[in-house]
From Swiss-Prot:
Activity control: Na(+) is not transported, but it plays an essential structural role and its presence is essential for fluoride channel function.
Known catalytic reactions: fluoride(in) = fluoride(out)
Keywords from the named record: Cell inner membrane, Cell membrane, Ion channel, Ion transport, Membrane, Metal-binding, Sodium, Transmembrane, Transmembrane helix, Transport
Membrane topology, from the record: Multi-pass membrane protein
Taxonomic source organism: Pseudomonas fluorescens (strain Pf0-1)
Classification via NCBIfam families: crcB, PRK14234.1
Name of the coding gene: fluC
UniProt protein name: Fluoride-specific ion channel FluC
Biological role stated in the UniProt entry: Fluoride-specific ion channel. Important for reducing fluoride concentration in the cell, thus reducing its toxicity.
Annotated binding of Na(+), by residue: G76, T79
Family named by the database record: Belongs to the fluoride channel Fluc/FEX (TC 1.A.43) family.
Transmembrane feature ranges: 1-21, 38-58, 69-89, 99-119
Molecular function GO labels: fluoride channel activity; metal ion binding
Any one of the GO BP annotations: cellular detoxification of fluoride
Taxonomy, superkingdom: Bacteria
Length: 124
């Protein structure tokens, strides 16, 4: 159990740091478009979880520590629903209703599409 906990923890640290770096970069370069950091990590995370899920279906012998470290740890640290929700509320509160609705729609449907695309890539 300890190796599994370590794998998830290390993956979580890496994913969280990547999300933090992405947010800092976007805020430094595109402060008016703060929401694009969350959108980017969530869409990329959805693509990656689709790819990993498909690969692990093909290769079930991949150790649970690797699977959990990547899917639960890394992708769990990288992606975030709470930040997506806060970004949407911030856009709504600033009166940018069409942008908020578009952002929410792209996040949800883009995430679903990216997950499907990632899984489909493993079936080529």
């Amino acid at each position: 159990m300890v190796p599994l906990i370590v794998a998830v923890s290390v993956g979580g640290i890496a994913g969280t740091l990547l999300r933090f770096a992405t947010g800092n970069w976007v805020n430094a370069n595109w402060p008016r478009h703060f929401y694009t950091a969350t959108l980017a990590v969530n869409i990329v995370g959805c693509l990656l979880i689709g790819v990993l899920y498909g690969l692990f279906l093909i290769r079930p012998e991949v150790p649970i520590e690797v699977r959990a470290g990547l899917m639960v740890g890394f992708l769990g640290g990288l992606t975030t629903f709470s930040s997506f929700s806060l970004d949407t509320v911030r856009l709504l509160e600033s009166g940018q209703v069409p942008l908020a609705l578009g952002y929410a729609a792209i996040s949800v449907f883009g995430g679903l599409l990216a997950t499907w695309a990632g899984l489909s890539l493993t079936k080529l």
